[in-house]
């Protein structure tokens, strides 16, 4: 799925997502001290704007220019204080983020393809500064049964799940949350996602 695919998908609707921040982010990041955040697969910017509104300096990254333009427009509407805290960046994960640059790396419901050498994933892990937080939220695979019935080519094993990432973390990390739990927000329209899988880990060094 390339930039053209996602641009077309965003153009197919006036708004693809709700514009609200994801529940996992709100629950897990509300108590963190604001700093520098990387929002991976930011879409139309709901999470980025929530973070910026709480004092974070946010780098919001997505492959879709259409999504980024919508996010930037929403930031402008939210006011200069919020808009000035977000940098909207078009990139895919072949572009490695700068190491140690972020106090929070957040990846919410982003389909990150699993790789034998974990190159893209390790780039994201390296982007977390010592003392910073990695936060990943995903749909529970048990809720995907109906989707798999309609899309038999879909292979969930082709993508990292939060628990997969937890197993790859070394002793330079402290895992604080690694669990499956009920969603705190309504699932996307037309889906049956009722549980989230969540990983929150703190980089020690």
What are these regions (language model features)?
Residues 1-32, 35-43, 142:
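Conserved class I S-adenosyl-L-methionine
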Residues 44-94:
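Class I SAM-dependent methyltransferase SAM/SAH-binding core
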Residues 96-104:
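A short acidic, Gly/Pro-enriched loop at the edge of an enzyme's catalytic core
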Residues 103-117:
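A short SAM/SAH-binding and catalytic strip from SAM-dependent methyltransferases
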Residues 118-130:
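A short glycine-rich, Lys/Arg-flanked "PGG" loop and its adjoining helix->strand segment in the class I
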Residues 131-139:
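Conserved beta-strand signature within the Rossmann-like core of class I S-adenosyl-L-methionine
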Residues 156-172, 177-178:
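Short alpha-helix
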């Amino acid at each position: 799925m390339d930039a053209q695919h996602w641009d077309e998908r965003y153009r197919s609707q006036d708004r693809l997502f709700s514009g609200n921040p994801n529940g996992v982010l709100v629950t897990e990041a509300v108590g963190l001290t604001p700093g520098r955040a990387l929002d991976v697969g930011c879409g139309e910017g709901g999470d980025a704007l929530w973070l910026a509104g709480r004092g974070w300096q946010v780098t919001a990254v997505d492959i879709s220019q259409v999504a980024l333009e919508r996010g930037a427009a929403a930031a402008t509407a939210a006011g200069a204080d919020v808009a000035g805290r977000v940098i909207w960046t078009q990139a895919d994960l072949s572009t490695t983020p700068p190491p140690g640059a972020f106090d929070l790396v957040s990846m919410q419901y982003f389909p990150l393809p699993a790789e034998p050498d974990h190159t893209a994933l390790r780039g994201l892990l390296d982007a977390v500064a010592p003392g910073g937080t990695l936060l990943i939220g995903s749909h529970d695979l048990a809720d995907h049964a109906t989707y798999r019935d309609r899309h038999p080519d879909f292979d969930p094993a082709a993508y990292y799940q939060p628990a997969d990432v937890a197993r790859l973390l070394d002793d330079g990390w402290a895992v604080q949350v690694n669990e499956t739990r009920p969603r705190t927000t309504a699932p996307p329209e037309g889906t049956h996602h009722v549980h989230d899988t969540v990983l929150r880990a703190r980089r020690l060094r």
